[in-house]
């Protein structure tokens, strides 16, 4: 079973994404801020990160930069930030996709599956303690 880490602080979106992804047989891990995410990465197998930009203790752009520097885990931004400069920044930081809220369920699932097809799960696995 593939694991998706959702980094989101909005409870309504968390519940909706969890329901949608679990229905598609994904294991869902929830982190509500940057600190929780930093602690979760490297402690469990994660195949994909769905990342918001506006977080209570930091921003998703900086978190994406960190994730890309230390792991090979693919990132999809899922955010209300719809300015062209934000989309370009997210993709320039290495995100595999950028989806603007509100989103369509089928489109989100299709984009998630397309990203996962491009990544071999063994390549995305990081071992506890491997991040310096």
Which functions belong to the PLM regions below?
Residues 1-119:
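N-terminal/domain-start alpha-helical segments
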Residues 114-132:
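Short, Lys/Arg-enriched segments at the junction into DNA-binding effector domains
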């Amino acid at each position: 079973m593939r694991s998706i880490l959702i980094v989101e602080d909005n409870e309504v979106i968390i519940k909706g994404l969890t329901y949608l992804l679990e229905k598609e047989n994904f294991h869902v891990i929830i982190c509500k801020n940057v600190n929780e995410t930093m602690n979760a990465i490297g402690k469990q197998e994660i195949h994909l990160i769905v990342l918001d930009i506006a977080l209570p203790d930091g921003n998703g752009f900086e978190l994406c930069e960190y994730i890309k520097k230390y792991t090979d885990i693919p990132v999809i931004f899922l955010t209300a930030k719809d300015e062209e400069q934000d989309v370009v920044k997210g993709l320039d930081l290495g995100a595999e996709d950028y989806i603007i809220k509100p989103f369509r369920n089928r489109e989100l699932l299709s984009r998630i599956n397309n990203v996962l097809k491009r990544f071999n799960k063994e390549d995305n696995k990081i071992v506890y303690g491997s991040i310096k």
